[in-house]
Amino acid sequence: VYKVEQIKKPLENYRDIDAFKIYVSDLGLLCAKKDLAANDILYMVEEINDFKGGMAENYVNVQLTMNGYRTYYWESERGAEIDFIIQRDGQLIPIEVKSADNTKAKSLRVYMDTYKPTYAIKLSAKNFGCEGNKKIVPLYAAFCI
């Protein structure tokens, strides 16, 4: 997943080929590589708290890719980061992924204040809903995007 330097269409033209993230296409393989037991994942034991965010992002990237989206990410000069940006129906949609109980999305607020998208998507453990122009989608429903 490449970082985009500018939020303009087409995103492909504004990617930074030297800044990227690598995701695994199979979460089972990722967990096996990290030597995580199935119960650790199912019950989200405290010892894996530092790894939950990466797993959630990886899962969402797999779902977005399977739905045909090309994914990018964005980072501000001050360190705000949007996990994914996709192009859908001619719009650039920022997507924030939250795995922790604290679902405040400060980076998403920075992005929205700067670029004024029509709407954004926040994936978390919360149920479906809306917060202003943010659509809240449960992580388990990432395939619906």
Predicted regions located by residue number:
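Accessory nucleic acid-recognition modules appended to NTPase machines
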Residues: 1-82, 86
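Structured loop/turn residues at beta-strand edges in well-structured enzyme cores
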Residues: 80, 89-90, 115
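Residue-level signature for short turns and capping positions that connect secondary-structure elements
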Residues: 29, 91, 99-100
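Catalytic cores of nucleic-acid endonucleases
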Residues: 99-139
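C-terminal helix of von Willebrand factor
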Residues: 139-145
